[in-house]
Amino acid sequence: LQEPIAGQIRVFDQGMVGKEEDEATDVRRRWGVLFQGGALFSTLTVAENIQVPLREFYPEFSKDLLDEIARYKIFLSGLPPEAAHKYPSELSGGMRKRASLARALAMDPELLFLDEPTSGLDPIGAANFDNLTRDLKETLGLTVFLITHDLDTLYAICDRVAVLADQKVIAIGAIEELLAIDHPWINAYFSGPRGRAARRGHSDQNDKVRAEMQQRGRS
C-alpha cells in the first residue's frame, strides 16, 4: 500500500519495489494475509469473505467450486461448518480471527503473513490460535511471517525472531541466540517478568510433551 523510501523488499527472491503491477500480482497470489483487526467485510458471510480473493483472481470458478473451497478453508481454520453462513457481527472475537485466517488461506498460499494474530484474544484463545498456526505450518508446509508482541506466541511457534528497536532491526536469530545478546531492549523484553514467565511456560510444555512421548514408548 505504501512504497518504501529506502531499501528493498524481496519476496520469493523477487524485488517488489517498482515492480510492474501484473508481475507484482503474480507474486501476491502466492501469499495470504491475516490483518490485525481481521478486516472481514461486514456485509458478507464467512463463506463469501473467503471467496473474495478467489472471485478476483479466478472469475471462471463455478459457485459450487467456490462453496467447496470455502467449506474446506473453514474446516482448516477450526471453525464449525455452520459458521459459513454467519456474518462477522455474529461471531466471537476468536471466531473472527479464524474466519480471517480461512480467507488468508483461500489461495493455497506458500507464505502466510500474520499481523498480531493473538491480539484481543484471552489466554486460552491465544494458545489455541498458536497451536492452530503451528499445525497448519507443519501440515501445509507454510512459511509463516508474523508480527507480534506476544511472548507466548514467540516461544510457541517461532523458529527465528527479528527484533525491531530504535527504528531498525537490531538482531535476528532463534530466541536462545537473542537471549545471549547484551542489549538493553532485548534484556528488558526477554528477561523481564513476562519474558521469564513465557520461558518457564514453554519449558514446562516441552517437559510435558517429552514425558508423554516417553510414556507412549513404554506402552
Indicate residue ranges for each PLM-predicted region.
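Conserved catalytic motifs of ABC-family nucleotide-binding domains
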Residues: 108
